[in-house]
């Protein structure tokens, strides 16, 4: 396959999607990480902070000038209209930065761009922009145990997050390829990623030291 390849990458929380993105980056892909962009937007004095404060009030901004993630998470999962108001602030800014990073990666000559998007399947606009969709999958039990250990959330909190995302079946139905990452070692996962890259004909090559 010649030319720039646009690969959508998604998976439920705790699936290992970000690890897969990192492995693809090591092969030379440019990664556009929607979560990382959103975190930047809501970091201290980030581009979204003023609108969040105006919409939700100063109680949702920490003393450092960042969005209070814990408080906002609780509100968003309890009140769908609040979540929609937050998304109306965040999503246009994420799209703008995504477009900037995509253009930059293309101009730099990357063979493929990986769009790491947690809510890719839920979106009505992403699929038409992509050549392929790769889903990183694992069982719900594995999701829960990983996220509880990583984020210090309760089981109930993790289950609410999982319930707010696309169903496992929905994600799998949208996939052009699937990596089942339930109990893979990092080495085994890397081999799976290499196989997927070959399957799609991605011309990714490991980065040389001066490119990293």
Swiss-Prot record:
It is found in: Cytoplasm. It holds the Pfam family CoaE. Keywords: ATP-binding, Coenzyme A biosynthesis, Cytoplasm, Kinase, Nucleotide-binding, Transferase. It catalyses: 3'-dephospho-CoA + ATP = ADP + CoA + H(+). ATP binds at residues 14-19. Its main location: cytoplasm. GO terms for molecular function: ATP binding; dephospho-CoA kinase activity. Pathway: Cofactor biosynthesis; coenzyme A biosynthesis; CoA from (R)-pantothenate: step 5/5. Gene3D superfamilies: P-loop containing nucleotide triphosphate hydrolases. Residues 6-211 form the DPCK domain. One of its GO terms (biological process) is coenzyme A biosynthetic process. GO terms for cellular component: cytoplasm. SUPFAM superfamilies: P-loop containing nucleoside triphosphate hydrolases. The keyword Hydrolase does not apply. Its EC number is 2.7.1.24. InterPro entries: Depp_CoAkinase, P-loop_NTPase. Catalyzes the phosphorylation of the 3'-hydroxyl group of dephosphocoenzyme A to form coenzyme A. Belongs to the CoaE family. PANTHER family: BIFUNCTIONAL COENZYME A SYNTHASE-RELATED (PTHR10695:SF46), DEPHOSPHO-COA KINASE-RELATED (PTHR10695). This is Dephospho-CoA kinase. It comes from Albidiferax ferrireducens (strain ATCC BAA-621 / DSM 15236 / T118) (Rhodoferax ferrireducens). The gene is coaE.
């Amino acid at each position: 396959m010649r030319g720039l390849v646009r690969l959508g990458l998604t998976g439920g929380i705790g699936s290992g999607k970000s690890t897969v993105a990192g492995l693809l980056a090591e092969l030379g892909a440019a990664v556009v990480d929607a979560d990382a962009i959103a975190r930047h937007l809501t970091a201290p004095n980030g581009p979204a902070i003023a609108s969040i404060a105006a919409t939700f009030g100063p109680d949702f901004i920490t003393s450092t000038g960042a969005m209070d993630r814990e408080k906002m998470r609780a509100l968003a999962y309890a009140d769908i209209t609040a979540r929609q108001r937050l998304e109306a602030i965040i999503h246009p800014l994420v799209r703008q930065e995504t477009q900037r990073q995509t253009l930059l990666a293309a101009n730099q000559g990357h063979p493929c761009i990986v769009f790491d998007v947690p809510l890719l399947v839920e979106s009505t606009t992403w699929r038409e922009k992509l050549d392929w969709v790769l889903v990183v999958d694992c069982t719900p039990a594995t999701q829960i145990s990983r996220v509880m250990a990583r984020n210090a959330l309760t089981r109930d909190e993790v289950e609410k997050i999982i319930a707010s995302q696309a169903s496992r079946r929905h994600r799998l139905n949208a996939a052009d390829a699937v990596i089942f990452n339930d109990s893979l070692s990092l080495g085994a996962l890397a081999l799976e990623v290499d196989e997927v890259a070959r399957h799609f004909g991605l011309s990714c090559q490991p980065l040389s030291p001066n490119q990293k």
